[in-house]
């Protein structure tokens, strides 16, 4: 089993940006002490939904502040920045940390990012594929060049080269079927969403495995991650109530982030994400409190045993043994750390990998 910690860097209304940044550093260090394998940093722009416009910089700080902890991005919006510049940053982190950096990528969800950074969001799928191939080749070859409809530049060395053999490990935040299929074609591990239930997670892994095998990948050694909003307390109601105010503001902040520009919903290629929201509303979850209650049904929020039951059910359904939690909904930094430590002592030791049964005929 492996355990990760998502550091959201959401700014609640009652806290300053300076306080959120202090939390980031402290929680990163505490994560290492609590036995977490990796902390994950999210890229967001122009919104208090997440204060990290450049996760590479934050990753560099946390890698320098820790000794064994891996630090990853979950995720870099790959199409919105030049691929050479991105690989330079990834390789630098890979070298300076001696292989402790994890390169999580995504296609991007927010129209605002593409518009401000001058990238056509309607081309996000094609750009994701093009940028990924350039970066992957650059990791192994040590140079990059491009001459296609999306980008043109002459052959250049990418320095420093990668420290890790084959380059820093790459992960994909995958929410739609199309992104799941894309990740499977390339044999890349997925970070699964915390907003889907066990059946959806199982179906996503089954789709991935089917496609990955068609492309010749060994599906038994792919380090997929299950992600969760997490709050652990011996009092179940206390765990739920302490998260409610944070999650309510956080959800509202997410909605605001997706609609900074009035015509954001006209972008092509995001029908799954729009449909997911429509389905959510049809199920009666438009009310913020109902959305929070539904989140409690599918995330480890409650007593240690309740948390174990929810996570173990997903492990058994998917076979995934890399568990990534976000604890920031727990209130103050001291309350967050208390929940992390209780998770370490009363949840981590009792989660088990899915048992693989073999049958022999004698």
Swiss-Prot record:
SUPFAM superfamilies: Bacterial luciferase-like. Keywords: Flavoprotein, FMN, Luminescence, Monooxygenase, Oxidoreductase, Photoprotein. The keyword Flavoprotein applies. Its EC number is 1.14.14.3. One of its GO terms (biological process) is bioluminescence. One of its GO terms (molecular function) is alkanal monooxygenase (FMN-linked) activity. It is an enzyme of class 1 (oxidoreductase). Pfam families: Bac_luciferase (PF00296). One of its GO terms (cellular component) is cytosol. It catalyses: a long-chain fatty aldehyde + FMNH2 + O2 = a long-chain fatty acid + hnu + FMN + H2O + 2 H(+). CDD domains: Alkanal_monooxygenase. The synthesis of this protein is regulated by a complex control mechanism that has been termed autoinduction. Heterodimer of an alpha and a beta chain. Light-emitting reaction in luminous bacteria. Belongs to the bacterial luciferase oxidoreductase family. This is Alkanal monooxygenase alpha chain.
């Amino acid at each position: 089993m492996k355990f990760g910690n998502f550091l959201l860097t959401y700014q609640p209304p009652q806290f300053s940006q300076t306080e959120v940044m202090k939390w980031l550093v402290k929680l990163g260090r505490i994560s290492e002490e609590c036995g977490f394998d990796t902390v994950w940093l999210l890229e967001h722009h122009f919104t208090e939904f997440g204060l990290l416009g450049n996760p590479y910089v934050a990753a560099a700080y946390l890698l320098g502040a820790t000794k064994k902890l891996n630090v990853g991005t979950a995720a870099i919006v790959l199409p919105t920045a030049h691929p050479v510049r991105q690989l330079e940053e990834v390789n630098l982190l890979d070298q300076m940390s001696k292989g402790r950096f994890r390169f999580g990528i995504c296609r991007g969800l927010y129209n605002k990012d593409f518009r401000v950074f001058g990238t056509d969001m309607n081309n996000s799928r094609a750009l994701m594929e093009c940028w990924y191939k350039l970066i992957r080749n650059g990791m192994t070859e040590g140079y990059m060049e491009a001459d296609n409809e999306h980008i043109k530049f002459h052959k250049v060395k990418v320095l420093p080269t990668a420290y890790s053999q084959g380059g820093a490990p790459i992960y994909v935040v995958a929410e739609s079927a199309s992104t799941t299929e894309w990740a499977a074609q390339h044999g890349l591990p997925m970070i699964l969403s915390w907003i889907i239930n066990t059946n959806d997670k199982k179906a996503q892994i089954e789709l991935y495995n089917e496609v990955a095998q068609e492309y010749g990948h060994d599906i038994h050694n792919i380090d997929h991650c299950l992600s969760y909003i997490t709050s652990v307390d011996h009092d179940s109601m206390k765990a739920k109530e302490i998260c409610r105010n944070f999650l309510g503001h956080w959800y509202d902040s997410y909605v605001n982030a997706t609609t900074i520009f009035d015509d954001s919903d006209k972008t092509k290629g995001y029908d799954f994400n729009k449909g997911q929201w429509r389905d959510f509303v049809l199920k009666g979850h438009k009310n913020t409190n109902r959305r929070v209650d539904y989140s409690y049904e599918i995330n480890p929020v409650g007593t240690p045993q309740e948390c174990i039951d929810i996570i173990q059910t997903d492990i058994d359904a998917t076979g995934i043994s890399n568990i990534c939690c976000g604890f920031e909904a727990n209130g103050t930094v001291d309350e967050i750390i208390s929940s992390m430590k209780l998770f370490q002592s009363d949840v981590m030791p009792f989660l088990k990998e899915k048992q693989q049964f073999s049958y022999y005929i004698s």
